Amino acid sequence: MITPKKIQFANIPTPLEEIKFEGKSFLIKRDDLTGCELSGNKIRKLEYLLADAKRQKADIIFTSGGDQSNHARATVIAARKIGLKTKLFLWGKDTTSPNGNYFLDKIFGADVQFFSEKEYENVNDIMFEQRMELLKKGKNAYAFPGGGSTTLGIWGYINFINELKEQIDLKKVDSIVAAAGSGGTAAGMLVGAALNKLNVKIVAVHVLMSKEEMRKQILQLAEGCVLDYK
C-alpha cells in the first residue's frame, strides 16, 4: 500500500503497561500519553489529516462533534500548531460560561456553530454546503467528520500496529481491544494487522452506534482505505 505523508505531533511510541487480573495478563497501551493538550488517540489520525490539509493549501479546518468532543479540541489545537484556524460544528447548546473542552476550543480561537440533535444528523451536508460557499469566496476549507475517521485518518492506527509490533511479539497476543465511537481506530488496526499478516482479533467496543452499524462502519473504512491506497 502507498503510505501517505503525515505531520509529527504525537509523542510516540507510547509506553505499554502490564496488569494482571484473575489470572489473566493485560497490556495497556498508554495512548493517553501522546501529548498533554492532544491526549488520546485523536492525534494519530490528525497527523495524516492535517498534513493533507496543508498539501491542499487549506485556509481553515471544518470538523464536528459533541460540545465536549475530545476530537474537536485536539483538532483546534493541532491546527493552530500549523497556523490554521478551525470551525467546529457541534451538537449541543452554547453557554455564556464555556467549560472543559469547549473552553479550550474558545481559548484556541475556534469558530463554533451549535446544532440541535435533529439538525446534527445532517452535519456532514451542512459542512459541505458551507465549504462550497467559502470556495465561491476564494477560500479553501478542509473538512473531515467527527472522530477524524476517514480512509486517510485511519492510517494513524495502521501505523499504530507497526509501532506495537516493535514493542511486543504480536503473534503471542490474542486480542486488541479498543473503544469504538466513529470506527477509525478499529478500522486502522484491522488493516494494520492484515498488512502485517497477524492472526490477532480486533475487538471494537461500540459506544455510540449499534453493533451492526459499528461493524458496517469499520469494514467500510478498512475496505475503502485498501482501495484508496493500494
Model-derived features: positions:
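PLP-dependent amino-acid enzyme catalytic core
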Residues: 1-230
